[in-house]
Every structure is written in C-alpha cells, then in structure tokens.
C-alpha cells in the first residue's frame, strides 16, 4: 500500500509543471504594477504569464539547484496546491478580459464562475477583479512559502538517488 501511494505521488511529481518561485513571484509583481483596467495592460499580463518557462529536466539532466540571495531556490508545482487553481484563474481571467477565446495557452477554457446575469457576461471588469484577486492570492502564497519545494525535496519525492561514480560523472535513478 505504501509503495502504491509513493508511486502515485512520484508519478504526479514527475509529470508536473515546475516553476522557479522567483520567476513566478517576479512575473506576478510585474503584472500587479500595471493598470489592469486598461485592456492593453491585461494583454501584457497575459503575455507575461504565457512567457513563463517551466523548469526543464529529465532522466539524464538533474533538476537545477540554483542559489538565490536567501538560500537554495524553491520550486512550485503548478499542478497542485494553491497554484493550480490560481494559475487557471489567472489564465482564464486574462482571456475573458481581452476576448472570449475558446482556449488559452494552458488549454484551459475560460469559464469564470460569476452570477448568471447579463452584466457578468458582458462586463470584463468583473474578470479583471478576479484577476487582481488571483494575483494577490498567488503573491501571498509565494511570499508565505506555501507548497514550495527544494531540489532535494523533489528528488526525494520522486525517489531519485544520484551517485557520482569513481571514474567520472553520471547518474543512477533509483
């Protein structure tokens, strides 16, 4: 039973989209500086969010171990915790604020839970309010350290063991 649970958790972590905490926080703060009542600023926000690049790694490339001013870099799993719903809300809100597109960059259809009345369907300021709220919640979660992982924590969760053989570099996944 314990192995099955570990295997499910490791599979989810391996398939997840990981972002550097600092990249995500910098992007959120750049967006919050803009005037989101202006459509051009919402388009700029959408472009900033779409330009976020996930951490690239694989079986032969170790998860990056970056140092920041305060210590080791922390990473965010965009598929779990508070970040999954918040990122979806941010993507959907930017889509709803700029146009009624059918799908955004993450493949999320912009469905925003609002009261079913004509004002909510026609008023982009409501989705901009949701965008501001989601940005504030995301910034708060990142600053408070909610669901953040270091490289070591991620590798432990995946069960990866790295060995440096006596004759040179390399790795062994366990």
From Swiss-Prot:
Transmembrane segments: none
A Gene Ontology cellular-component term: viral capsid
Record's compositionally biased regions (Polar residues): 98-118
Species for this entry: Nicotiana velutina mosaic virus
Principal subcellular localization: virion
GO terms, molecular function: structural molecule activity
Listed name of the protein: Coat protein
InterPro entries in the record: TMV-like_coat, TMV-like_coat_sf
Compartments, record wording: Virion
Stretches of the chain forming a coiled coil according to its record: none
Database matches in Pfam families: TMV_coat (PF00721)
Keyword annotations: Capsid protein, Virion
Region of interest (Disordered), residue spans: 98-126
Paired cysteines (S-S): none
